[in-house]
Amino acid sequence: MDLLVDDLFADADGVSPPPPRPAGGPKNTPAAPPLYATGRLSQAQLMPSPPMPVPPAALFNRLLDDLGFSAGPALCTMLDTWNEDLFSGFPTNADMYRECKFLSTLPSDVIDWGDAHVPERSPIDIRAHGDVAFPTLPATRDELPSYYEAMAQFFRGELRAREESYRTVLANFCSALYRYLRASVRQLHRQAHMRGRNRDLREMLRTTIADRYYRETARLARVLFLHLYLFLSREILWAAYAEQMMRPDLFDGLCCDLESWRQLACLFQPLMFINGSLTVRGVPVEARRLRELNHIREHLNLPLVRSAAAEEPGAPLTTPPVLQGNQARSSGYFMLLIRAKLDSYSSVATSEGESVMREHAYSRGRTRNNYGSTIEGLLDLPDDDDAPAEAGLVAPRMSFLSAGQRPRRLSTTAPITDVSLGDELRLDGEEVDMTPADALDDFDLEMLGDVESPSPGMTHDPVSYGALDVDDFEFEQMFTDAMGIDDFGG
């Protein structure tokens, strides 16, 4: 498995691929931001030394450079154009932040922490790994539920291991932010003293922290944790996708009944081929809804979720969703996930004899410091009554259709692809005039262990070969473009 993963991601660094999935996608689909350096699952990524105190804008750009995440702001903006709750399925890991005093909503706590804190200067590996091994596909489809649980457990282990490093990075940047604000306040205090205005330095610092520290910290945390969740999801899902596409027999007739609609929209989907029915509490997922979710996944460079029962023959795999201005946005749901971390310290700690208020930010007093709020915090989703406080990755209910109940394979009238199976085909050293259909018929399937022969009187239908499904070319074309194979003559 390690070799397969290494092969997938070895050449991704330093390559600027074209927009994702050019074959079969809508012509008016906007291009996603370019891929940043993905690297290998086993390859460490060490952060540079802690930043120096600089203005918040420069500090934000430094974070993007350190992460290699120049597409971060564009992706944050893209989240404002969607309504789907993409993040509620992720564990919040709020317990990891209960002792992070630099996240306290009391400026006096931040001052005490900032004056005493020493930035972490030892190497910080933001690709740290957990103790759980990457699960391999089972031998039989009856083991798919266990495989799903193993994938979810692996994701949780990797997420928690990496989040410890990201938490340290956030502390280093918050320390640099605090020291810059403190230096600015000291300069203003000296100027006020020279003009004969005696002002309390600590009170000035508290006011500045209340005005700027929390806003800038939330801005840093937003791009930092987007990098964490998106980067880790890409690594794991593309590795799993490469394995799952090689074993279509495991997913024939697979039916998945999800617990909630937010589970369907979650970015991390351990099973990407559901060739039976796809339902949410027994309600079939509409084809357009699946296309809209796949549009989002495509623009975030994540594998698409395929379902033969939900897809319509001849229809594109993705459709741009229509933004509903009166509904919650993906960026707001993401901020709720981040706020669960940022508010963790203040939700359990007390300082200076005060009990931290636990209500939503909208109901807090105007003088109460917080990390911002969004309209999403006031909305009730259709499945809120049954959603646990810590949603996590809930396994779907799985079953399998019998052979006679399985949906027919989807096909399109003509594949839109740059791949030609008959280009420069040479056999036995001689140039042969052969069509793509002939090339497929000529291929010896016995080399792959496929010794089944057609029934008596049955022959291959050349029309079916002439109308190959777009999806047959999608994976090869996608990896050819993403890894720049054509550019290197591969």
Swiss-Prot record:
Keywords from UniProt, A to Z, are:
DNA-binding, Host nucleus, Host-virus interaction, Phosphoprotein, Transcription, Transcription regulation, Virion, Virion tegument
Tell me which species this is from.
Answer: Human herpesvirus 2 (strain HG52) (HHV-2)
Q: Which Pfam families match?
A: Alpha_TIF, HSV_VP16_C
Its lineage reads:
Viruses, Duplodnaviria, Heunggongvirae, Peploviricota, Herviviricetes
Oligomeric form and interacting partners = Interacts with VP22. Interacts with gH (via C-terminus). Interacts with the virion host shutoff protein (vhs). Interacts with VP11/12. Associates with the VP16-induced complex; binding to host HCFC1 activates VP16 for association with the octamer motif-binding host protein POU2F1, to form a multiprotein-DNA complex responsible for activating transcription of the viral immediate early genes.
State what protein this is by name: Tegument protein VP16
**Where does the entry annotate site (Critical role in activation)?**
F443
Q: Where is this region: Transcriptional activation?
A: 411-490
User: Where does the record place it?
Assistant: Virion tegument; Host nucleus
Q: What family is it from?
A: Belongs to the herpesviridae tegument protein VP16 protein family.
Biological role stated in the UniProt entry: Transcriptional activator of immediate-early (IE) gene products (alpha genes). Acts as a key activator of lytic infection by initiating the lytic program through the assembly of the transcriptional regulatory VP16-induced complex composed of VP16 and two cellular factors, HCFC1 and POU2F 1. VP16-induced complex represents a regulatory switch: when it is on, it promotes IE-gene expression and thus lytic infection, and when it is off, it limits IE-gene transcription favoring latent infection. May play a role in the aggregation of tegument proteins around nucleocapsids during virus morphogenesis.
Molecular function (GO) terms for this protein are:
DNA binding; molecular function activator activity
Per the record, residues carrying Phosphoserine are S16, S351, S411, S453
Q: Which SMART domains match?
A: Alpha_TIF
